[in-house]
C-alpha cells in the first residue's frame, strides 16, 4: 500500500494540538519537528542493513548498520524546513537537498525557483518533507526533479494530506510511498486543506497568515 496514515497515539495527540488556532509559533514549530521524527521512524522501518563490527568494552562485537549511501532529506521550501530537524534528529548523518517551489495562487500550479540536490541520488533513499500535501503539484514537481537527477527510491513525509493531493502524486508516481499523520477531508475553493492546519509556513515561521 503506497499510502501510510500513521495513527500512532502520539502522532494523533500531537497533531490534535497543532490544529488549535491559538497555538504559539514556538509550539507549532516544535510539534512539527516531533511529528516529523515519528513519521521518519515509520518511513525508515524497511531500510537495508549490513553487518559490521565494532570494538566493545569486552572486545569485538558484531553489529548492524544502515547499508549504502546516506539518506538525503529533501525539504520543500519554505514550510518543509519546519520538519527537517525532526528527520535529522533520527538520521543525523543525512545529506540535505533543498528544493524551492512557489504556488501560483490563481492556477495552484507550482514553479521552481531553487534546486540544490546532493550527488549520487541513484544510491540514496530520498525523504521529501513538506507539511501539507494539498493539490500535490509541489510534491509531483519535486519527485520529477529528483528522478531526473537519478533518484530511484523516494518517499514523501507530510503532516496532513488531502485525498486530491494523494491521487495526484500516485497518478504521476505510483512507486512513491506517502507517509502522513492525517488524511483530511479535502480542499476548499482556494486549494487549502480542510480542516488542515492553516498555512503551515506562516505558522512555523511566525509570519502573518492570510485568512480567507
UniProtKB/Swiss-Prot annotation:
Pathway info: Pyrimidine metabolism; UMP biosynthesis via salvage pathway; UMP from uracil: step 1/1
UniProt keyword annotation of Magnesium present: yes
EC number: 2.4.2.9
EC class name: transferase
CDD domains for this protein: PRTases_typeI (cd06223)
Single biological process term from Gene Ontology: UMP salvage
UniProt-recorded Gene Ontology molecular function terms: GTP binding; magnesium ion binding; uracil phosphoribosyltransferase activity
Isomerase listed as a keyword: no
Keywords, sorted A to Z: Allosteric enzyme, Glycosyltransferase, GTP-binding, Magnesium, Nucleotide-binding, Transferase
Binding site for uracil: 193, 198-200
Cofactor(s) in the UniProt record: Mg(2+)
Stated regulation of activity: Allosterically activated by GTP.
Domain of life the protein comes from: Bacteria
Cofactor binding description: Binds 1 Mg(2+) ion per subunit. The magnesium is bound as Mg-PRPP.
Catalysed conversion reaction: UMP + diphosphate = 5-phospho-alpha-D-ribose 1-diphosphate + uracil
Annotated 5-phospho-alpha-D-ribose 1-diphosphate binding sites: 78, 103, 130-138, 199
Function: Catalyzes the conversion of uracil and 5-phospho-alpha-D-ribose 1-diphosphate (PRPP) to UMP and diphosphate.
Family according to the record: Belongs to the UPRTase family.
Name the UniProt record assigns to this protein: Uracil phosphoribosyltransferase
Organism: Bordetella avium (strain 197N)
